[in-house]
């Protein structure tokens, strides 16, 4: 997954217009690649790669992002997308644990709004899927901003 193809996506002529997509996917591209490269440089055996990544998720990232959202009173839709990207990342690379959206956060930002956004982003998990389904996402933004 950490190869030239992902970096070519960022150079795609349409990419600059999809800032919301990039907020969600920054985690799923940049962070795992950074850990992967770090493991390669440190000659970590393949069977042990991502162990430090999983450890960081459990100890830091999930709790930190939950806390930041709970403490924020000026959260924008981009922040929610970045947060959902973080959860998506946690659940992709650490299948032994389930990282749910806490009810407390759903209560603050609206369970229906967060669930709907999460469902939309789930069907837009690649750039190609996003291009196919971007109207659903734009309709969602229009709905919540009106």
Cite the ranges covered by each PLM segment:
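Metalloprotease/metallohydrolase-associated module, dominated by Zn2+-dependent proteases
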Residues: 2-79
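Pan-zinc metallopeptidase signature
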Residues: 47-146
